From Swiss-Prot:
Excises uracil residues from the DNA which can arise as a result of misincorporation of dUMP residues by DNA polymerase or due to deamination of cytosine. InterPro entries: UDG_fam1, Ura-DNA_Glyclase_AS, Uracil-DNA_glycosylase-like, Uracil-DNA_glycosylase-like_sf. This is Uracil-DNA glycosylase. It comes from Bacillus mycoides (strain KBAB4) (Bacillus weihenstephanensis). Pfam families: UDG. Belongs to the uracil-DNA glycosylase (UDG) superfamily. UNG family. One of its GO terms (molecular function) is uracil DNA N-glycosylase activity. It catalyses: Hydrolyzes single-stranded DNA or mismatched double-stranded DNA and polynucleotides, releasing free uracil. The active site is at 65 (proton acceptor).
Amino acid sequence: MENILQNDWGPLLGPEFEKEYYQNLANFLKEEYEEHVIYPKVEDIFNALQYTSYENTKVVILGQDPYHGPNQAHGLSFSVQPGIKTPPSLLNMYKELRDEYGYEIPNNGYLVKWAEQGVLLLNTVLTVRQGEANSHKGKGWEHFTDRVIELLNEREKPVIFILWGRHAQAKKKLITNTSHRIIESVHPSPLSARRGFFGSKPYSKVNTILANMGEREIDWEIPNL
């Protein structure tokens, strides 16, 4: 799997692939992919890191584990493949975006446009069994994605971390470099969005920070497909 990382994440994360926890994880995944339906496809597991290189990462939106329905997950947190109905949390993200910028809600949940602009759409667990949320929790992915966050924390150039909900906010302890910025609220899930996600203006906050740093702002508008 380490050969998949073809950009600057490769040498940074290379040592992880040699560690015992990752060897155990790789063995577990081999069996899981052989015996069960696992999402995303093997070739999509590291898409977040593929689309958004270490040096190009401006923003991190931290998710939990991949969508576990057919053909949804493709390696980017909150994003779904073209032709798949937009999930409820992402729909709420779009509603907040509409309220902030006036953008129409698109007919898809394909967030590659964000990833290509430097928004790292990272789940803390990168695989899941079909229909079984959190089924790959505690198998080693958390060590790996914690290392991703630690590496970004070590970077001199500031990163904006968007932490929605308690699960994401638990990673705040890894962000110790005071040059980085943290934007947090409750999760956009329908269960919590009205308790402080709606009206939190995360997208314009990101762009204000980027503009103040002299960086290109993110074009958050997702086009219809």
